[in-house]
Amino acid sequence: MGGVVLAVGLVGCLLVLLPWKRLLPDGAEQRTIEHLPTLGMVLSWLPFFLLVQRFVVDDTTVAAVNASGGASMPLLYRVAATWSARSGPLLLWAGFTASLAWWWRAPMQGESPEVASRRVGLLGGFAALLMLLAVHLRPFAPTLPGTLRGELNPLLQTDLMVVHPPLVFCAYAYCLSIAATGISSIGQPDQGLLDRITIQARPAFVVTTLAIGLGGLWAYLILDWGGYWAWDPVETGSFLPWLALAVLAHARTVPRKVPGVVLRGAALLTGGLALFATLVTRAGGAWAASVHTFVVASEGSAPNDAFGRIVALAVDGSAGVEVMAYLLVLLVLAGWWLVDLSLAAGREAHPRWLVVDLAVPLIVAAAVLVEWSTTFTTVQPGVLGRVVPFGSAWVGLVLFPSLVMTGWPRADVRGKNGFARPFGVPVDWLIAGAIANLGGDVLLAVVWLCLFSPIAVSSAPTSNIPAAALGVTLALVSAWTELVPLYVAGLMLVPFLAPWLMMDDDASPEVDIHATLKRAPLWAGAGIAALMLVLTFTILLGSIDQIHFAAHEVYGSVLLASTSGALLLYSLRRESTTVRLTMLIGLLLVSAVGALLTPGLWGGDALEGLSNVVLRGHIAWLVVPTALVAVPHVFSEVLHSARRRSTTPWWRRVPVQAHVVHAGLLLLIVGHVMTTTLVDRGDPAHRITMLKDEPVEVDGWTYTFRDVRLIPGEDLTVGDGAVHVVIDVSDGSEWRGTAEPGMTRFDASGFPRSEVDVVRGATGDVVLIFDFTQAGDLMQTVAMEGEDAVDAVRVTVYRLPQSHAVWVGWGLMLLGMTGLSLSSRGKEKHLPAA
């Protein structure tokens, strides 16, 4: 039955993506045609709901259910077990993607029926690809005889895991819908493109923010991190599409018209980063995990770059096909961007729609052939370290059609070669190949090529300042994080600086301070988000074996401070240039003096180092003062915009909601510094040993171990038994509350779950985490001698002042983003469906 339902789901995706009005004869029944996409959308969900039903009834004849299900779990947890199976999220993602293709199936503003049908076809086609990948993973495969019963990962047996993963894949479906909009508009007029993207980006921003926030809340309450954010590769990967959406959301504020090619590039980037985030999550072991995942023989060695490890996964029959499919689509998106740049620079395709209609099958066919021919070579014992040369050739062949498919220059630009295309020679491609082979990271080389191409194909390269800024950031961060050798970083850097190094001195423009202060806040939204994106992505590429927490915090702090400064400048736009400059310079002086004289003022682990010269307190002084000063000014902007007379209700006014989002962001920045930057979670000083009824004082707070509670499995919602310790918490002489951190035992998996408890107060939270390495001895002592026999316990304690700012800020951002999405309702100008 499962195979039949999967086939039905695939047919449903096809019903959504096909342009029925063009395929069926003119005399076909109109009502029938209109219902076919709706029928397809419904059918696309059937495989997912059947898998959910199998988990709900605990059908152990299905291998996935036998591995992760459980009749004793609450109903919602059995539903959540669906996305613990590898195929479950794919079916969920396919359903969301097909639903969005169906929802926006009519031509949008400025979109012709032909372009709309291509957009819907691209999105529906990706849903079909996901369905095919799910078929390959066999979600309804029968349980083999003798297979032992498994158990859902204890960390997933929580309420938040019921809603967090579906929201993540819904967000990624939105990102792919935006990418399909960008692809379908290549070679077409730019009229209405920004409106079409914005209509989709605003709800995508809401869903992505909600998904990431709930993931952070899950980490805060369930994981033993003692915080909501740790720059873990999976959460960092999901942060990248959010940053791309931030770039799109601020496209309207840029103080000049954004070219269509840039909008399409940002749209493609959004979809590509959703795929990359999925790669980080599902390319098991590639990021910050055991490298043994990729070793297939004793004499083999794992590749030391992300791309090499992903390609090495091709040997895995289940994960390999899925991961390679995502990688291929990622490269195809990069190819479309390169083609669009060539078209914008004056080259032309023959025929025009060759770019969209034939690019994908040609590129995928070539890539599959090369992947088939090189996979066997790259995974042979002893040669895993030589993946990069094969990978470079593979990627080169995948992207090669992008270089040649656009034909010849148009007559009006013939003879005007691009900056890095002397006599038509693609020097930029040659440099990218050198970066891949010398630096050893093919993904980094592809990103470099995508950033440099706007300069390479342009006959006026100095007009591409944003691309140059992003490229310089990419090169510098690659050097700082030792992702590539220094000489390779130099090879990456010089081409971005070359146009300005070659420029005449008298061609340098004069700087107008007044105009700069006026325009800078308008550029900041998109610009800072883009710089943060490049920074985060580059550090993540280097985090395959360890998390570079310090790099994220130190380098990102400059951009966080710039964000606060830009919002403050915008709030002071009615003031004179002197007032604004005085405010900024004064804040910089306060930060500098404070960092030099009193870096430990902020408390916590402010005096702990993030590098040889940078303390955590230095970061706090750089970021927090400007953010604190900006908060009241931005809230005043909210009130000012809401009180302004208008026929539009205040809750549907874009300025009001945008200022609410910005106010929430500032609070979130302050909360992040206080609860993440200033807390050294690797410091053993946070682990304290408490003797029974003897208070232990740490940083002015007192913790007293009172009792031990042993909880049998029948009294638990999930788990086979638990041990909790009762601890009184007080601030000096004032009692703050009682915490009961502990550990829950899961016998089937043998995997204990740490139970975090939080004591909340007006000034912030105190997080207490039970050290479960003592759990076995403690349980045995209680069982044999009674609870009174336990006279000491170990607990990790993190005090997080101003932690409420994180959640209040997140809530305000969601509130404002929802208002922005509602302000777009009714503005979609649809034409009859294609």
Regions found by a protein language model. Give the residues of each.
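Contiguous transmembrane helix-bundle modules in multi-pass membrane proteins
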Residues: 1-24, 36-39, 46, 60-62, ...
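Transmembrane helix-loop-helix hairpins at membrane boundaries of multipass inner-membrane proteins
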Residues: 23-88, 117-157, 218, 289-291
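Transmembrane-helix bundle segments that line or gate the permeation/cavity pathway
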Residues: 44-67, 71, 80-101, 135-141, ...
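Transmembrane alpha-helix boundary signature
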Residues: 48-67, 75, 81, 103-117, ...
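A conserved hydrophobic secondary-structure block that centers on an alpha-helix together
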Residues: 89-90, 96-143, 147-216
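Interfacial helix-loop-helix junctions of multi-pass membrane proteins
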Residues: 214-235, 286-291
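Extracytosolic and intramembrane catalytic regions of membrane-associated proteins
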Residues: 697-802, 812
